[in-house]
Amino acid sequence: MEKVSIVCFFFFLLFGSGYGGLPPFWRATVVTMTNLIGGPPLTIHCKSKQDDLGIHVVPFKQEYHFKFQPNLWKSTLFFCSFQWDSQFKSFDIYDAQRDQGICDDCQWEIKPDGPCRLGKKAKCFPWK
């Protein structure tokens, strides 16, 4: 009986107590985006398969951020639309296949030519 209790407790820790079925010790990821479009406010709308984070209007040189826990299967994906003036762009702001292991605190600068990831393995990407 004791072995069954230990196994049940282990599965509870592993799958039952964290957001998205993750253990409580699984590190959260923060995505921060800074509006460097060049003047107009930037309207950001981010989603995953499970969550719609809503619409946010971010003034020039200001930030918008959100926090989540990536899943164990490296399939977490958050995609965002970006709108300013008459421009409408989109980008996968967090793709576990690309970003997991590179950033837990993912800093992005949103520019007219595309988003740029800062930090280790800094890189600018084209819009989708």
Swiss-Prot record:
- InterPro entries under this entry? Self-incomp_S1
Q: What cellular-component terms does GO give this entry?
A: extracellular region
A Pfam match is Self-incomp_S1
The record's family statement is: Belongs to the plant self-incompatibility (S1) protein family.
UniProt lineage: Eukaryota, Viridiplantae, Streptophyta, Embryophyta, Tracheophyta
Q: Name one GO biological process term.
A: rejection of self pollen
Name of the protein described by the UniProt record: S-protein homolog 5
Q: Species name for this entry? A: Arabidopsis thaliana (Mouse-ear cress)
| Region forming the signal peptide | 1-20
